[in-house]
Amino acid sequence: MKDIVPPPPPVVRNDVAAVQALFQQHVVPSYGRFDLVLSHGSGRYLYDITGRRFLDLGGGIAVSSLGHAHPAITEALVEQSRKVIHTSNFYYHEPQGRLAQALVSLIGPGKCFFGNSGVEANEGLFKLARKFGHDEGRFEVLTTINSFHGRTLAGIAATGQEKVKKGFEPMVPGFRQVPYNDLDAMRAAVSPATAAILIEGIQGEGGVTPARPDYLLGLRELCNEKKLLLFMDSVQCGHFRSGRFQSFQRILEGVPGGDAFLPDGISMAKSLGGGFPIGAFWVRAPYADLLGAGTHGTTYGGSPLACAVALKILDVIQREKLADNVRQVGAALKSGLEQLVHKYPSVLQTVRGLGLMLGLELAPNIARLPGDPSKTQAVRFANLLHGAGLLTIPAGAQILRFLPPLNLQASEAAEGLRILEEVVAPLAA
């Protein structure tokens, strides 16, 4: 047996290069990382190992629903870990049952399955579609161009972006993409092999583009007509990020027939655990028992610890009325971004999105933008914002996403807008 190797000594507090060297030597280089070494967080702020503070308007890509080091999450982690962390799904435990009950109450009649991530949730929906259509030879899932559904083999096959597929061909069969928000294209794509349609209520990686109300209602009608399952990928746009639990609920507010809209399956993750790994999919009642015993499973999914954390987050969101906060602060942030677009059209082009899921599109070919020209404008712009103390998330070559914690304060949104203008103004001069 190999001798046990003692852990290396901790890196000196402010030695950024030493930490980066650990990654270069020991971590698979599958991520393009920014030159920041973060050490801790508090509320809506993150700190690096040199002591610099950053306002986090990226939220770990829509994950940090309550910000950083929230006492309620810490309490839930400690309290549940003192009881039991993991049991396996051979046994019942209360937190999983209560969390499923809570999610069903927020969506509609159905049942939930729990995993560890968004892509696992989507994989569950893919298997559900195959099970649903199996006896008729239907297995195909239609998705949309510019969509993003994860990085497993099925996830990249479902994703409507060629960059994630390159080098991993041949693709898993059974997925085709059509333009987003184009009902005629989706209808034309349905074939005898089609079992389901999967879309995002708001495309995230594809540029923060919300679905149109008529598109959602038309898809439901199409699926009813063709006997297809309608799935929604709510991994990024769900969990109150739009101001309602599900983005389709917000998009269809006040729209005739909108209250009756319900998909057949929904994938969830990210904000659900606030940083603790958990994913889930909800299945509408008529199809909730398709995946019977032995057809699907996961070792860690729905552990007592993960479910206790998710329950506590839901409790805080509802008790502190954070859905209202998302609407109010999100509207102020969007308005502020639109004012900057109007003021600096040579740098900023458009704003889109709902609630606290906003996309800021940069103008093409910003002449004064510094940085490595081999990098996208979005990455170079994000680097400038880092230098000023603001974190955002690039989406594609031209878009910055704002995906902050749901408890972002109005004063913090104003601070973010001030920092953004400080960076933009010299570029427009």
Go through the PLM ranges and name each one:
Residues 2-429:
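Conserved N-terminal phosphate-binding loop of PLP-dependent enzymes in the Aspartate aminotransferase
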